[in-house]
Regions:
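Left-handed beta-helix
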Residues: 74, 83-246
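Unchanged
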Residues: 1-127, 240-242
Length: 246
């Protein structure tokens, strides 16, 4: 799950409500074709949770459970023990679903960017979604930095032949070709005449001269130099493995 939230506020909302458990959810209108590996909540008018069930793709408007909840430690431990006694396959969501009638379980809506990355298509879709500047602003905030491992590199070099549109490009790259609607990782080399469209290119990849790739995810250290056209259908993006040479 990829999202941004102030957990202090979430915890305060839970305490003020007096609920036993508070679940975080995101309202979506495309649940028929997306979030098919997620659980969805059944809510009453007071935002009380009546059920936690798998998304079967039979309704477009759903409340997707974000696998985030707040409860007292003692309650959490007792639920885990009860679930273990019932079945080793029982999850926390399963036992919470069983307790909807006996516990006060409530839902809190999340606002802003949200992506559930549970398979390859959702990974690709989440990367493409963040090319939208408004969506990126909902996730990344100037006054709320993201702590991550740093890697100092020189700025990306754009040559005279470079043509870049609507893309996110990390530092340390050398861009001589065309890049459109793509995410380019650190230290990539895109040679003269190369075209990269609608693709996610991870770090240290080399795209050779006159190579055309479209709708692809290219893993680290791959070299695309011999095969001149690698294009997958937009609805089924392709994957090029780490360290591959094509």
């Amino acid at each position: 799950m990829v999202y941004s939230i102030d957990f202090d506020q979430f915890l305060h909302t839970h305490i003020e409500s007096g609920a036993d458990v508070t679940l975080l959810y995101h309202a979506v209108d495309n649940a028929k074709e997306a979030y098919l590996t997620c659980n969805v909540l059944g809510l009453n008018r007071q935002k009380g949770v009546e059920s936690i069930e798998p998304n079967h793709g039979n309704k477009k408007n759903q409340y997707v459970y974000m696998d985030t909840c707040v409860m007292k430690t003692e309650l959490f431990i007792s639920l885990i023990k009860e679930a273990k006694n019932l079945s080793s396959m029982y999850t926390l969501a399963d036992i919470l679903n069983d307790k909807c009638e006996t516990l006060d379980i409530r839902g809190v809506a999340h606002k802003g960017f949200f992506a559930s990355i549970t398979d390859f298509p959702s990974y690709y879709a989440a990367n493409m979604a963040l090319l939208n500047y408004k969506s990126a602003q909902e996730l990344f905030h100037d006054n709320w930095p993201i702590y991550t491992r740093t890697n100092d590199s020189c700025p990306t070099q754009y040559f005279n032949t470079a043509d870049v549109k609507n893309s996110v490009i990390s530092n340390g790259c050398q861009i001589e070709g065309t890049v459109e609607n793509s995410v380019i990782g650190r230290g990539c080399v895109i040679k003269k005449g190369a075209v990269v469209r609608n693709s996610v290119v991870l770090a240290e990849v080399t795209i050779g001269e006159d190579v055309h790739i479209e709708n692809e995810v290219v893993d680290k250290w791959a070299k695309l130099v011999h095969k001149k056209e690698i294009v997958s259908p937009a609805e089924q993006p392709g994957y090029i493995r780490r360290n591959d040479t094509l």
